[in-house]
Swiss-Prot record:
Family named by the database record: Belongs to the thiolase-like superfamily. Thiolase family.
TM spans (from-to): none
PANTHER family, sorted: ACETYL-COA ACETYLTRANSFERASE, CYTOSOLIC, ACETYL-COA C-ACYLTRANSFERASE
Keyword Zinc among UniProt keywords: no
GO annotations of cellular component type: cytosol
Subcellular location as annotated: Cytoplasm
This protein's name: 3-ketoacyl-CoA thiolase
The reaction(s) this protein catalyses: an acyl-CoA + acetyl-CoA = a 3-oxoacyl-CoA + CoA
Record's keyword terms, sorted: Acyltransferase, Cytoplasm, Fatty acid metabolism, Lipid degradation, Lipid metabolism, Transferase
Source organism per UniProt: Salmonella agona (strain SL483)
Single GO MF descriptor: acetyl-CoA C-acyltransferase activity
């Protein structure tokens, strides 16, 4: 094992996560229909600051992400600063790492803290699948540019006459990989077939996720980390995730048809995460700054790792690649963990990664490691459910997982937790957290 790389400042301070918050997560075109991601981000950051009672000028940086970006607000981070009453001099920039975007935001704030350029910052992400940048065809886009430069009405009419009716149809955002044309669900189908994951196994994991999430809400475990929201016309509160199906049975899952490979597939809408709207954020600072402000941190960021693999086959294996690296940098093994939380993009993807984490052959032949990362104990795995149940607003999921894991570690008396996710483009992310 290589030497551990502790995340500390030049003064030896640990990187503290003092609080975290998220909106409830809403299925596409439901509670947050018509609410853009930038407004969801303002909601959560404004409420996070109000609850923390931290002086507004104590936050020196805000790093925020959005995967489905809107052209009118390309720097969502700066718009959040300007829209929440934060100090206008607060540095703010936006990041994007697909489904691992808020992992990246957290890493960036941590690096600023370690460099000593700031002592406190906010990291997070927001996405809306209900407010989308609906585009136009390439043919229409080109004509519109040319029309803007045309000098006469006749020239403009000539340009428009070149268009066909199909060129006028709106173009929704792409749901496929730019480089391969494969949809995420196509990759999940690849993984199910490669690793022999059955429909029954996928449905069982999805059912488990919903049952655990419903139980977490019923026991009040999420109340402190999920805010109540009000949206126009501001009459009814929206306070709980609306995708969770606590009353579902395994028989219900079996009724659905495959969503991607219609003839021979096993990936369905029920064993996949749904399109979702929501936002999440965390406040981070140096350990000494937290003490100065009289704050007890939720926990600490011990290590992180980002990885990348090829996109043509089984590209959602990011957790199997990034987890051993994050553990190594933390100076830990799988056995040292109290909790292990993996983003459930698809049940097939989740089960494939769990299989490979325990595979000696994968460790030796693919990762070049002497031994497997380790089997994940079911008693430690996604104990409060995962993304299949909660939903997945792309840029917000990492911050949700971090906050949720730290709260659960605190309830268990402390320990180490690892959160990990796959992401489009063959990317992976993992972070080791510590709570006392």
């Amino acid at each position: 094992m290589r030497q551990a790389l502790p995340l500390v400042t030049r003064q030896g301070d640990r990187i503290a996560i003092v609080s975290g918050l998220r909106t409830p997560f809403a299925r596409q075109a439901t509670a947050f229909h018509g609410i853009p991601a930038v407004d969801l981000g303002k909601m959560v950051v404004g409420e996070l600051l109000a609850r923390s009672e931290i002086p507004a000028d104590a936050i020196e940086q805000l790093v925020f992400g959005q995967v489905v970006q809107m052209p009118e607000a390309p720097n969502i981070a700066r718009e959040i600063v300007l829209g929440t009453g934060m100090n206008v001099h607060t540095d703010a920039y936006s990041v994007s790492r697909a489904c691992a975007t808020s992992f990246q935001a957290v890493a960036n704030v941590a690096e600023s803290l370690m460099a000593g350029t700031i002592r406190a910052g906010i990291a997070g992400g927001a996405d809306s699948s209900s407010v989308l940048p609906i585009g136009v065809s390439k043919a229409l886009a080109r004509v519109l540019v040319d029309v803007n430069k045309a000098r006469t009405t006749r020239q403009r009419l000539t340009l428009f006459s070149r268009l066909r009716l199909r060129d006028l149809l709106p173009v929704p955002p792409a749901v496929a990989e730019y480089s391969t044309g494969l949809r995420m669900g196509d990759t999940a189908e690849q993984m199910a077939k490669t690793y022999g994951i059955t429909r029954e196994q996928q449905d069982a994991l999805a059912h488990r996720s919903h049952q655990r999430a419903a139980q977490a809400w019923a026991e009040g475990k999420l109340a402190e980390e999920v805010m109540t929201t009000y949206v126009p016309p501001y009459k009814n509160p929206f306070a709980e995730d609306n995708n969770i199906r606590g009353a579902s049975t395994l028989a219900d899952y079996a009724k659905l048809r495959p969503a991607f490979d219609r003839k021979h597939g096993s990936v369905t809408a029920a064993n996949s995460t749904p399109l979702t709207d929501g936002a999440a954020a965390v406040i981070m600072m140096t350990e000494s700054r937290a003490k100065e402000l009289g704050l007890r941190p939720l926990g600490y960021l011990r290590s992180y790792a980002f990885t990348a693999i090829d996109v043509w086959q089984d590209m959602l294996l990011g957790p199997a690649w990034s987890t051993p690296l994050a553990l190594e940098r933390a100076g830990l093994t799988m056995a040292d963990l109290t909790l292990f939380d993996m983003h459930e993009a698809f049940a097939a993807q989740t089960l494939a990664n769990l299989q490979l984490l325990g595979s000696e052959r994968f460790a030796r032949e693919v990762l070049g490691r002497a031994q497997a990362t380790g089997e994940v104990d079911d008693a430690k795995f996604n104990v409060l459910g995962g993304s299949i149940a909660y939903g997945h607003p792309f840029a917000a999921t990492g911050a949700r997982m971090i906050t949720q894991t730290l709260h659960e570690l605190r309830r268990r008396g402390g320990g180490f937790g690892l959160v990990t996710a796959c992401a489009a483009g063959g990317l992976g992310a993992a972070m080791v957290l510590e709570a006392e």
